[in-house]
From Swiss-Prot:
Entry protein name: Glutamyl-tRNA reductase
Reaction(s) this enzyme catalyzes, per UniProt: (S)-4-amino-5-oxopentanoate + tRNA(Glu) + NADP(+) = L-glutamyl-tRNA(Glu) + NADPH + H(+)
Anything else known: During catalysis, the active site Cys acts as a nucleophile attacking the alpha-carbonyl group of tRNA-bound glutamate with the formation of a thioester intermediate between enzyme and glutamate, and the concomitant release of tRNA(Glu). The thioester intermediate is finally reduced by direct hydride transfer from NADPH, to form the product GSA.
Keywords noted in UniProt: NADP, Oxidoreductase, Porphyrin biosynthesis
Species this chain originates from: Bacillus cereus (strain ATCC 10987 / NRS 248)
Amino acid sequence: MHILVVSVNYRTAPVEFREKLTFQATELEQAMTTLQKQKSVLENVIVSTCNRTEIYAVVDQLHTGRYYIKKFLADWFQLEIEEVAPYLTIFEQDGAIDHLFRVTCGLDSMVVGETQILGQIKDSFLEAQQVKATGTIFNELFKQVITLAKRAHSETTIGESAMSVSYAAVELGKKIFGELTDCHVLILGAGKMGELALQNLYGSGARKVTVMNRTLSKAEIMAEKYMGHAKPLSELQCALLEADILISSTGASDYVITKEMMTKVEKMRSGRPLFMVDIAVPRDIDPAIDELEGSFLYDIDDLQGVVEANRAERLKEAEKIQFMIEEEIVLFKTWLSTLGVVPLISALRDKALAIQSETMESLERKIPTLSDRERKVISKHTKSIINQLLKDPILVAKEIAAEEGADEKLALFAKIFDLEMEDVESRAEEVEHKRAWTPSVPSL
């Protein structure tokens, strides 16, 4: 089995391509279910955010897995593989494990050290579990990754000076206007990104804020928290007439604001400029609007320069976290290496318990006057003897599993204890394809 990551992210692809490969939240479960049926894929988790779409997979063959995951992406988004391939980055084995740790800890984010990605990774993992797209390997790996990310943020200061994308959008507005107290700000979208933007706006002194959303009640709830006003999306054109700054993050699949709409609006704004920050992927605002004289449009990729603040300080903390990651990778690989010995240990235990059971039956035939209590006491003590006898051999088997040439040594181990290899291999298949185990996931 191999661990594989297929990634398209802000480093490798511009926003105009990333938006073509963005999974909507409502389709993630179906996407993971479909991917799980692809040849070579044994487990999978799909993560899709404004800055990345990534497929994490356990595959039985690397070459086959790579091909079918690329094909899945192309088919799902109705593109040709040749269109998708140039923008993809592939991580395998140790590189894939390291990448997952780095992403979840915020080290691979546009804003180094941000914590939003941790919640997004956890949510994607839980959805994958719900549709039975994860198994023994990813259940253990993601649990370990989420735990480490929480520890990294609590034991370092990397998150204290990190900006979110929403914060960067507000900072851009402050660079343009200075004080935001007298600015009319329009927020499109009442999701997490929109609320973070509104929270940062309020903290920066903005009080003339309007929130718009397809569901008016959500906009009203969000606006009320920060002394803003809510309006239905049907009044968008009127709201654009009043706004000085627009921050948009709706999650819509099509443009919410078109060039045609803004052309009409500009004619009624009497030459007043409108600064628009589109942090949605797919984008909410038609990029052609930037051609208009009075509209100044920035997308999520344009925020890169803004988020450089305090970067040097955060990179020092990132080095500490990378060291923590390397330690965790060693622990995970040790666990992974012993996974193959589990069926062998199980077979050894079963054989010992079978002997104990036969011994108890023989004893009951020879001493039929034994009471129930006496039987239980004898059974308990004979099982205790078995556990004591097996303790050292099991520890040795686990150590052997982590060594080079483990297969030959474990085969000798099985021969010493007269274990049938066919039974062991059958158990190995059961472990490999196990889907039922669901570990507890650390809370955020």
